[in-house]
Amino acid sequence: MTAAHTRILELRAELDQHNYRYHVLDEPSIPDAEYDRLFHELKALEAEHPDLVTRDSPTQRVGSAALSAFTQVKHDIPMLSLGNAFDETTMLEFDRRVTEGLDLPVGDLFGGGAAVEYSCEPKLDGLAVSLLYQDGELVRGATRGDGTTGEDISVNIRTVRNIPLKLHGSGWPATLEVRGEVFMSKAGFERLNASQLEVGGKTFANPRNAAAGSLRQLDSKITASRPLEFCCYGVTTDISDTHIGNLQQLKKWGMPISHELKLAKGIQDCLDYYRDIGERRNSLPYEIDGVVFKVNSIASQRELGFRAREPRWAIAHKFPAMEELTELLDVEFQVGRTGAVTPVARLKPVKVAGVTVSNATLHNMDEVARLGLMIGDTVIIRRAGDVIPQVVSVVPERRPENARAVQIPESCPVCGSHVERTQLVKRSKGKETVSEGAVYRCVGRLACGAQLKQAIIHFVSRRAMDIDGLGDKTIEQLVDEKLIGSPADLYTLKYEQIIDLEGFADISSKKLITAIENSKTPTLARFIYALGIPDVGEETAKVLARSLASLERVQKALPEVLTYLPDVGLEVAHEIHSFFEDSHNQDVIGALLSPQACGLQLQDQGELSAEFAASTTLGGLLDKLHVPSVGPGAAQKLADKFVTLEGVIKADWLDMRQALPEKQAKAVREFFDNADNANHALAIEQQLKDFGMHWDSEKKVVEGLPEAGHTWVLTGSLELMSRDVAKDKLESLGAKVAGSVSAKTHCVVAGPGAGSKLAKASELGLKVLDEEAFVAFLAKHNIPV
């Protein structure tokens, strides 16, 4: 090894150590001038010996040639969002759920129960990122994106000075994924804006926007010039048995963690921490919008698991939003995907929490009435959750004499169609109650440009039909040029029509045609979600597809039958039923599925879910009818006494009295004396028979499936299918798919990148399948891949 090479290695090690002491320990050991001298010495030596330059050298943070675009990165483990709390009541409820979920005794606020230990740290207002280390070296940085897919920002991440390019010490896993927040301090933000003003550049509204904009620069040299910092808040591979232990170990390896990190013993400690940080919020060197609390025990986190898009073991306690006074200049109306006509406040521009606000949500006309809002009023504006501006209240003493009432338009501001007022109806326990509220809708449907654009945007989105290349602006062009009038028209678009659109050339036009063609075989769940049924999100669409397993059954299902599905209440069930009853929607769906028109072919259709089919009983059906005064217990007594629905309907008063007290017996008799009620009950029963899920039907039950009673765990990435698809296939065999490994786990499917779950499975001696073996297992049970 030459003297120059030796000196280069010495300088790198020394500079790395100084970086660590400065950025992580906050204990600088040398003056800045001495650091600069060492840095420039290293830079000069590397210039003389370019063959000795390595990616992990401190000099390589300065940026490189500009990129044309960021590439997408799929997160092996999704970067989930957190549930929010805006008051102490919600925090207490969160603690209660955690305590009950861990089967601990629930005590009062100040003691008497088993206090859960929580980690506490400020919620930085920046951009969430993932850092991937291989053998201790930083190999990739990615944004959170939508939680599943982000952008590869590796070149820019390497310019953030307190992110170690190589981990310190030893003992780190071969693959380590660290997660945290890239942010800009208040002082750094002020310096950046001052320098931008000096050169006539664009200034930023707040540190978060500055951090996000800087990190997503295609030219990494610009990113390198910005005062960005990183703070680690988690890791995907457990390296300790507690969350705080994980962070402390990461700190030893060179990762900056929050100086405010603290362990709280019980919810009262959490509330005290929140109040303390809130009082010191303005004096902190960075902006925060709340505090994050996490169950500290990793084992407890695994036991609590996840729901939909967030962990059950963590919550963000947000600070109250900041408020300002301004003038309401006007109220305009916008039209949404479902035709709802909603008011939007146009405001005299005012800065709220560092952001200039000129528009604010008013939700609906009921909100306008509740506020007593008039055009010309002075209003209080709040950034709810520090994000969405909203009008909180009116200052009545400042109302001018010429203030005007807010009037809902009689015709749609977009298409001119009639605006219809529909009274809101609440359904609870079989009763329909007309509420004071109302919704205003444009009756133009897809003839209304606003509704059509929003419907198409939703239809083609990544989690729906996933048609790449159809951005919002392209959809606006297609609608404005009258090239499409419904989602079905997308499938009749020709190359000659697309190439004439702004922003399209030969290759991009052909790519769009191919993307549209490739979308013709969606899964049933994606198709249901793409239809844009009110109140039906991605998870509900998956439940509908997994349980009913055919579009025909979903279309025909009565509301009471739909309520057998997990997490589908009567309100949502009525929305689903009403959507498919609508003749206009039937026409659009018919065109999409017609071989002569669009020719979509839905995948994953088949037999009714065995678990769903086995979920019905006569007592359960009687309970779903919501007979006044009759709850689940009384319904089961009727089922035990009369055995059949027809027997209940035809039972006379004396027979009824043998099963129930007088008041309940009278209520049941009066209910079924109404022919509409009796006929509706029989119609529900007939549908249960038609679907093969009647309690007397010969049907497959979950216990008869090959993997019934077995718990499986999926970890790592799979190449031939997503983990969601793998989960669906296992559940179709009767298996339960869990998020954590335990002694009760039957089998673990481990793909590339499998971490602690695979290690735990090996430790417990559990059966482990790689993807090839898993595919063979599915084939054995005639499950296609």
Curated annotation (Swiss-Prot):
Q: What residues bind Zn(2+), as annotated?
A: 412, 415, 442, 448
So where's the catalytic machinery, residue-wise? 123
Q: Which GO terms describe its molecular function?
A: DNA binding; DNA ligase (NAD+) activity; metal ion binding
The entry's keywords: DNA damage, DNA repair, DNA replication, Ligase, Magnesium, Manganese, Metal-binding, NAD, Zinc
Q: Which GO terms describe its biological process?
A: DNA repair; DNA replication
Identify the SUPFAM superfamilies for this entry.
BRCT domain, DNA ligase/mRNA capping enzyme, catalytic domain, Nucleic acid-binding proteins, RuvA domain 2-like
Cellular component GO terms held in the UniProt record: cytosol
Q: At the top level of its lineage, which domain of life is listed?
A: Bacteria
Query: Which residues hold NAD(+)?
Result: 32-36, 81-82, 121, 144, 181, 294, 318
In terms of InterPro entries, this protein maps to: BRCT_dom (IPR001357), BRCT_dom_sf (IPR036420), DisA/LigA_HHH (IPR041663), DNA_ligase (IPR001679), DNA_ligase_AS (IPR018239), DNA_ligase_CS (IPR033136), DNAligase_adenylation (IPR013839), DNAligase_N (IPR013840)
Q: Would I find S-adenosyl-L-methionine among this entry's keywords?
A: no
Report whether Hydrolase shows up as a keyword of the record.
no
Q: What is its EC number?
A: 6.5.1.2
Q: Which family does this protein fall into?
A: Belongs to the NAD-dependent DNA ligase family. LigA subfamily.
The record's PANTHER family line, in alphabetical order, gives: CHROMOSOME TRANSMISSION FIDELITY FACTOR 18 (PTHR23389), DNA LIGASE (PTHR23389:SF9)
Q: Which NCBIfam families does this UniProt record tie to the protein?
A: dnlj, PRK07956.1
Main function: DNA ligase that catalyzes the formation of phosphodiester linkages between 5'-phosphoryl and 3'-hydroxyl groups in double-stranded DNA using NAD as a coenzyme and as the energy source for the reaction. It is essential for DNA replication and repair of damaged DNA.
Q: What is this protein called?
A: DNA ligase
